Design a protein with these regions (language model features):
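Active-site cores that bind ATP or allylic diphosphates and position pyrophosphate for catalysis
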Residues: 113-175
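N-terminal Rossmann-like or analogous alpha/beta NTP/dinucleotide-binding catalytic cores
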Residues: 2-136, 161
């Protein structure tokens, strides 16, 4: 009997061109993981709308991100490599999770405070609820491993909190 692979989930915001930091910080590791884990790698188009609202540019960026990542060695035959927005279950789960995410939790997020300080003209609900959407992305796949940058570690802690609150209210649904 074959052992079931553990699940990895991570997302990439399509906001610019792939650069060496992306490659050495994430892509190289994604390529290594694809043989050992069941991988879900997402182009996070909804997340990018929080800071890059031009939808024409977004569509072009999404296509380019797919091409760049495949060129770096990500194999669509080995991983689920998909765009976030067509997965409607994400939006539904995001709605439920927002009921578990209190205003105080979200306002103390370091990334939110940084964005408010850097761009006070663009303080939108998407920025405030970014960790909630990220939680939906993660727990939808029941991911055990979620490789993220240092700036996203607080979001992972919040994801655990939101998932635990969801389980407490609705029963043990998510690991």
């Amino acid at each position: 009997m074959s052992k079931q692979k553990e699940i990895v989930m991570s997302g990439l915001r399509p906001t610019g061109y792939l650069h060496l930091g992306n490659y050495f910080g994430a892509m190289r590791n994604y390529v290594k993981m694809q043989d050992e884990y069941e991988c879900f790698f997402m182009v996070a188009d909804w997340h990018s709308l929080t800071t890059h609202p031009d939808t024409k540019e977004l569509k072009e960026n999404v296509r380019r991100v797919f091409a760049e990542n495949i060129a770096c060695g990500l194999d669509p035959e080995k991983v689920a490599f998909y765009c976030q927005s067509p997965v409607y279950e994400t939006a539904e789960l995001y709605l439920y999770l927002n009921m578990m995410a209190y205003k105080g939790d979200r306002e103390k997020t370091t990334t939110f405070k940084d964005k408010v300080r850097q761009h006070p003209e663009n303080v939108n609900a998407g920025l405030l609820t970014y960790p909630v959407l990220q939680t939906a992305d993660i727990i939808l796949h029941r991911a055990k491993y979620v490789p993220v940058g240092k700036d996203q570690e607080q979001h992972l802690e919040m994801a655990r909190t939101f998932a635990n609150r969801f389980n407490h209210r609705y029963g043990d649904v998510f690991p």
